[in-house]
Every structure is written in structure tokens, then in C-alpha cells.
Amino acid sequence: KLNLENMNLALNKLKKTYKIYAPKVFEGAGTFSDTDRVRYGEVSTIEEIEFNEKSSYSYKETILPIRQTLFFFTEDDCKEAEVDERPALIFLRSCEIHSLKRIDDIYLRNGFEDIYYKKMRERAKFVLIGCEKSFENCFCVSMGTNKTDEYNAYIKVDGQDVYLDIKDEEIANIIASIEKEEKEVTPDFVKENEVNVNIPENLSLEVMKSTMWNEYNERCIACGRCNFVCPTCTCFTMQDITYKDNKNAGERRRVWASCHVDGYTDMAGGHSFRKEKGQKMRFKTLHKVYDYKKKWGYHMCVGCGRCDDICPEYISFSTIVNKLEGAMNEVKNND
């Protein structure tokens, strides 16, 4: 247990070793005029960290940048881009720690290791922010991601007091000289959400035949927001950029991509696997709650609810999931 002043002293010491990322308020950066946005950024003090609101974007952008230069090239040479070697200390919630396992599956355990992600992942440590209450649209309890013990440290702020549970030896050693009171600290976890989802046990690819997907041909505007705020979406595209002053030199960038946006499945000859918006919604939904579990043994979705929070058309992913049982019955009756 520390007071706020001593916690800031601890952060100051940690900042000499780590880049510290946490959800913080960006004033005036909201969707509407004179509104704020909570997303991840570097912090130096405990007061900067936003504990009481869910961040609009997940921690994902701290270890998987929205835009990342992989290498530079000329006519004769190719040079890998340098990576900031400083380790990172990232504050995040239980559902997001679970999502980290999903990103690791894709980039580290999916046939080969992605060296660019691996470099950033290996230098990251994670501080769990407890959830005393559920936020709007969260359904982490249904997805089994409301609890975790996979953290390097845990933090809770209660008024002028800060409670820490530190598992990582390096972090403990760095702040060992800070004045503190020894106490037993147990993380806060949500026990129930206002939103619950039911994923049918008999869910199969037959649900693709359901008419439920047609609704999203009209409602979805293919903006891709749901993918970009999601802590488990991992798709990207490649961009080769050449410089104006030398067309024979440039760089290759990896940039986040969205399975909802036009062009995602385009192939040579103008062909595309999924042209209708409802087909794209079906693909994303089944990836999150069907085929991923077939391969890895658990669902990709962690129930953070950000897709529901951000959708400009008020499409609710949790509602889509809860429609699947009816869709399976529809297909069964039609057969």
C-alpha cells in the first residue's frame, strides 16, 4: 500500500527503465465537438491514468502499432527498421490480458513466429487494472475473461491510497526503496455483467445459410471501426511507399486492416470472396465465436464490448451472438 505521492515516485523510478503506457484522457479528441477520448498513451504520473472509464481503443496499439515500418529499401539494399529497445510497462484490464493470448496465437503460434511482433512482445510487462464494476456493453463474464492471474503487477487506486500486488522481481526491486505498508492485496474482478451472451453448443457452419445476415447488408456501413477497437483483431495489409525525391527508394509498412472494409478479400482479376456486408459480418462473427475455438480451444472474442461502443449504426455484436441459436433453428427447420 502506497499513497499517491509515493506511487508517483515509484512511477518515476520505473520510467527510467520502462516506457509506461496506460489509458489516459485525450482532451478534445472525441467523436463529437468538445468531447474527450480515452485511449492509450505514455504516462508519467498516476493522476494521468484513467481508471474509471473503459478506453475507446484497446492496449493493442502499444504492441501492435497501427502503422509499422518493417524495412527500408533501395535499388541495391534492404535494411530492417530499428525498433525501440526499451521495455514497456502496460496497464490493462483482465479481458485484455486474455486477448493477449489470442494475439500471441496468431503471431507466435500459428505456423511461424512474426519477428516484428515478437520483438515488441518480449519486452512488454503488464499491470492489471481491476474492475470493481462492469462497464456498458461488457460481456466478459459470459466469455470467461473476467478473471486472470497472468499479470506482472496489479494496481488499485482507492482515494489517496494505491494498492499493489507485484509478482515481477525486477519491478519489485526497482521500487523497493519506496516507502510502503505491507498488506494482503487481492485483485477486483467483475462477477456479473448487464449483458450476457449465449453461444449455442450446436453452432455449426450451417448457420451461414440463415437469413439473419441479410439485415447487415443494409445496416452496416463497412467503416471498420469495430475491428480497429477490438483487442483480438489481428489482420493487416502491406504498403510499399516510395519517396518523391527518389522513386527507387522507399519502405514497406504493415498497416491494420479490416475484414469489413471493401477490398479486404479482393484478388487478381477483380474477384472477391465476400462482397455483401452481411457476408462480412457473418465471417467476423463466426471467426470470433466458432472457428477460432475449433483450432485453439477457446473463443477469440473476450467480451470487452468495444465493438458495440464504437459502432455508428448501433449494431450490437452481443445481440448478433445471441441471435445465433435462433438462426440455427431456422436453418434446421428449413432443411
Model-identified regions with their sequence ranges:
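General structural feature for long, well-ordered alpha-helical segments within catalytic domains
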Residues: 6-10, 226, 255, 316
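Ferredoxin-type iron-sulfur electron-transfer modules in oxidoreductases and energy-metabolism complexes
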Residues: 199-218, 236-335
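Oxyanion-binding "anion nests"
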Residues: 220-231
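Iron-sulfur-associated redox domains of electron-transfer enzymes in respiratory
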Residues: 1-204
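Short, well-ordered beta-to-alpha junction loops that form the rim of enzyme active sites
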Residues: 24-25, 232-234
